[in-house]
């Protein structure tokens, strides 16, 4: 099962690497390098899954998630926070912003694929 995935991270290497790994898994990947660009691309491509870095400079991941959840395309997207911040209050803040999952960097690509599979199987059943 494959998904259309939007990745947003201001660290170009991290975003591009994650994107390449997900493409190897058969997913369609769109990469953004800012929060504003993520919203723009989300409106255009209507992703199934959004993976957002929290610490982006122009618009952080919390703001992007809150904004997306209030837009038609973002209401049904599965949102994953991918961040270096992993304390309990960070996870709660992510949940309150509308994220479905919170993963702490560095993340195991196999874990991301496992989460995606679980989400896609659940979505189709």
Model-assigned labels for residue ranges:
Residues 107-116:
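C-terminal output helix
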Residues 33-37, 60-66:
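Acidic catalytic/metal-coordinating carboxylates
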Residues 15, 57, 87:
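The feature encodes the CheY-like receiver
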Residues 45-51, 56:
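Active-site beta3 strand of CheY-like receiver
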Residues 26-33, 41:
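Short hydrophobic/Thr-rich beta-strand motif most characteristic of the beta2 strand and flanking loop
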Residues 16-24:
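Charged docking surfaces used in two-component/phosphorelay signaling
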Residues 19, 63, 70, 75, ...:
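Alpha4 helix (beta4-alpha4-beta5 surface) of REC/receiver domains from two-component response regulators
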Residues 11, 54-55, 62, 85:
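The short loop immediately C-terminal to the conserved phospho-acceptor aspartate in CheY-like receiver
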């Amino acid at each position: 099962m494959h998904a259309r995935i939007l990745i947003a991270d201001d660290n170009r290497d991290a975003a591009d690497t994650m994107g390449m790994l997900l493409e190897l898994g058969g997913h369609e990947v769109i990469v953004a390098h800012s929060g504003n660009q993520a919203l723009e691309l989300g409106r255009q491509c209507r992703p199934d899954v959004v993976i957002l870095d929290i610490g982006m400079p122009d618009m952080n991941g919390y703001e992007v998630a809150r904004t997306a959840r209030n837009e038609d395309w973002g209401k049904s997207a599965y949102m994953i926070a991918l961040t270096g911040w992993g304390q309990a209050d960070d996870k709660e803040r992510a949940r309150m912003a509308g994220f479905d999952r919170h993963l702490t960097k560095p993340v195991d690509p196999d874990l991301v694929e496992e989460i995606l599979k679980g989400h896609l199987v659940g979505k189709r059943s």
